[in-house]
C-alpha cells in the first residue's frame, strides 16, 4: 500500500516537473522567436531606409508615409493635425490619428524626412511586427494547442508579407496588426472572465486600434457578440459585459469625434474620406474597365493628381469631400453601371485572395512579379481554406472568431481598393489558419 502511494507521489511529482519544464521552455522560446523576427526585419531595414527621404517636384517625400507622413510633418512643424497632402493646408480627418502622431514624434526627435527618422520609424514598425509573434502564439495556442502555437509564431517571424510591410513601408500596417491581433487574441478568451475591468479594457483597446485603422470596427461587434453568446449560454452577465465593452469603445472614440466636429464641422468618429474612396474606385473618373489594375494611374486622388490637389486646396476638405459624396450618388443614380460594379467587386474579391487581376502586358510591365505573387498568395489562401475546413470538422467553436475576420473585415476593401497592403490587419489570423491547414492532423490539437 505504501509502495503504491510512493509510486503515485513520484508520478505526480514527475508530471508537475515536466509541465514546469515545458512552461519554462515556452517562456524562453517566445523571446527567441521575437528576437529572430526583429533581426530579420532589421536586416531588411538596412536596405530600405535610405530610399525614404527622396523628393520629386510634386510627390515630395511621398515614400515617407504619403498622407500620414505629410500630416506628421505638419504636426512636427507646429501646424497641428492638418495638411494631408504636400502643400500646407487646413485641418484634416482624412487619416486616423495614431500612426501620424507616432511618426510626428519621430520627426520631432530626429528631423523631418531625415535619414535617421527613416531608419527609426522602420525600426519601430519592425519591432511592432516582431512583437506580434506574442498574440499570434497565444491565439494559435487557444485554437491549435502549444505545438501549433510554436509553429505559428515561427511562421510569423519568417512570413514575407510581415517582413516587407513592416521593414519596407512607412504606414500603419505593423501597428494595426499588433493591436488588432491582440484584440482578437483577447476576444477568443473574453467569455471565460467575469471581471468587468477585462471587458472595459477590451473595449478600450478596440477603440485605440480603431484610431490606427478604423476598418477594424467592422469586425469588433461580431467578435463581441460571439463572446457574449458564450457568456449568456453559461448563464453569465452578458448584457452588462457587452454594455461596458461598448461604453469603453465609444469613450475612446469620442474625443477624436469631437475634435473632427470642431475642426471640420463634420460628425465622423475617425476618418471622413470614405466617399473619396468610392468616387475614386467605383464612380466618377474611375476607369470604367474591369481589366484596369487596382494600382492604375489616373485616379482622382489629390495625392497623385495636381488638378484634384488644386481643387482640394481651393475648396477645403469638407466642401471637397462633400462634392465627391454628391458626385458619387448622382453618378450612381443616373449611370449606375450595375454590371460593371458587380463584376469589378467580384474581381476585387479574387484579387484580395489570389493577387490576380490581370496578366496583361501593361500590368506585367508595371508589376513584373505579378505571376510569382499570385502563386504565393493563392497557396496561402488554399492552406487557409484547408485550415478552415479542418476547424469546421473538429473544433467549430474555435473557428467562428477567425471567420469573423476573414468574412467581415475585407468587405470595406471589396467595395473600394483591395490591394494587399490593406490585408495586413488580418494577416496574422490568416497565418494561423494556414498553419492549421499545412500541419499533419496528428501533430496539432484541434
What are these regions (language model features)?
Residues 31, 120-144, 182-186, 382-386:
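Transmembrane-helix motifs of polytopic, lipid-linked glycan transferases
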Residues 37-40, 125, 149-160, 178, ...:
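Short helix- or helix-capping micro-motifs
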Residues 46-55, 60-91, 98, 105, ...:
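Extracytosolic helix-loop segments that constitute the early lumenal/periplasmic catalytic or substrate-binding loops
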Residues 93, 97-101, 109-134, 153, ...:
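Loop-to-helix entry region of an early transmembrane alpha helix in multi-pass inner-membrane enzymes
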Residues 115, 119-120, 324, 330-402, ...:
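Membrane-interface anchor segments at the N-terminal boundary of transmembrane helices
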Residues 115-119, 131-161, 177-178, 192, ...:
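Transmembrane-helix signature of polytopic, membrane-embedded enzymes
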Residues 143-146, 183-201, 209, 227-231, ...:
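Membrane-interface transmembrane helices that cradle and orient dolichyl/undecaprenyl
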Residues 261, 267-352:
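Membrane-proximal stem/loop segments at transmembrane-domain junctions that anchor or position
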Amino acid at each position: 500500500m505504501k509502495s503504491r502511494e510512493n509510486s503515485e507521489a513520484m508520478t505526480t511529482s514527475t508530471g508537475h516537473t515536466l509541465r514546469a519544464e515545458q512552461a519554462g521552455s515556452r517562456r524562453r522560446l517566445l523571446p527567441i522567436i521575437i528576437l529572430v523576427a526583429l533581426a530579420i526585419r532589421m536586416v531588411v531595414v538596412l536596405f530600405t531606409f535610405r530610399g525614404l527621404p527622396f523628393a520629386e517636384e510634386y510627390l515630395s517625400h511621398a515614400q515617407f508615409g504619403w498622407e500620414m507622413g505629410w500630416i506628421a510633418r505638419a504636426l512636427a512643424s507646429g501646424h497641428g493635425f492638418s495638411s494631408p497632402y504636400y502643400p500646407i493646408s487646413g485641418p484634416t480627418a482624412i487619416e486616423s490619428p495614431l500612426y501620424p502622431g507616432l511618426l510626428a514624434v519621430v520627426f520631432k526627435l530626429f528631423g523631418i524626412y531625415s535619414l535617421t527618422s527613416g531608419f527609426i520609424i522602420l525600426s519601430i514598425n519592425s519591432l511592432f511586427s516582431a512583437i506580434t509573434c506574442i498574440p499570434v502564439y497565444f491565439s494559435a495556442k487557444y485554437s491549435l494547442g502549444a505545438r501549433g502555437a510554436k509553429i505559428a509564431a515561427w511562421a510569423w517571424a519568417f512570413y514575407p508579407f510581415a517582413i516587407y510591410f513592416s521593414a519596407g513601408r512607412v504606414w500603419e500596417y505593423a501597428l494595426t496588426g499588433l493591436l488588432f491581433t491582440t484584440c482578437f487574441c483577447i476576444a477568443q478568451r473574453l467569455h471565460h472572465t467575469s471581471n468587468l475591468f477585462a471587458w472595459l479594457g477590451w473595449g478600450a483597446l478596440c477603440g485605440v486600434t480603431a484610431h490606427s485603422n478604423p476598418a477594424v470596427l467592422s469586425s469588433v461587434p461580431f467578435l463581441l457578440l460571439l463572446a457574449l453568446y458564450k457568456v449568456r449560454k453559461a448563464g453569465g452577465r452578458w448584457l452588462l459585459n457587452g454594455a461596458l465593452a461598448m461604453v469603453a469603445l465609444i469613450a475612446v472614440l469620442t474625443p477624436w469625434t469631437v475634435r473632427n466636429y470642431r475642426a471640420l464641422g463634420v460628425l465622423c468618429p475617425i476618418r471622413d474620406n470614405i466617399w473619396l474612396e468610392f468616387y475614386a474606385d467605383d464612380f466618377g473618373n474611375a476607369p470604367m474597365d474591369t481589366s484596369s489594375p487596382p494600382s492604375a494611374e489616373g485616379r482622382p486622388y489629390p495625392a497623385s493628381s495636381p488638378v484634384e490637389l488644386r481643387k482640394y486646396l481651393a475648396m477645403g476638405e469638407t466642401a471637397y469631400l462633400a462634392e465627391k459624396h454628391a458626385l458619387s450618388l448622382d453618378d450612381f443614380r443616373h449611370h449606375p453601371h450595375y454590371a460593371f460594379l458587380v463584376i469589378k467587386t467580384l474581381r476585387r474579391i479574387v484579387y484580395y485572395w489570389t493577387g490576380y487581376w490581370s496578366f496583361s502586358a501593361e500590368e506585367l510591365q508595371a508589376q513584373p512579379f505579378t505571376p510569382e505573387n499570385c502563386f504565393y498568395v493563392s497557396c496561402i489562401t488554399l492552406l487557409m481554406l484547408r485550415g478552415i475546413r479542418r476547424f469546421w470538422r473538429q473544433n467549430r467553436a474555435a473557428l467562428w472568431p477567425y471567420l469573423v475576420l476573414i468574412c467581415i473585415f475585407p468587405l470595406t476593401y471589396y467595395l473600394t481598393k483591395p490591394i494587399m497592403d490593406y490585408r495586413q490587419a488580418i494577416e496574422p489570423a490568416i497565418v494561423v489558419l494556414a498553419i492549421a491547414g499545412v500541419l499533419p492532423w496528428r501533430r496539432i490539437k484541434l
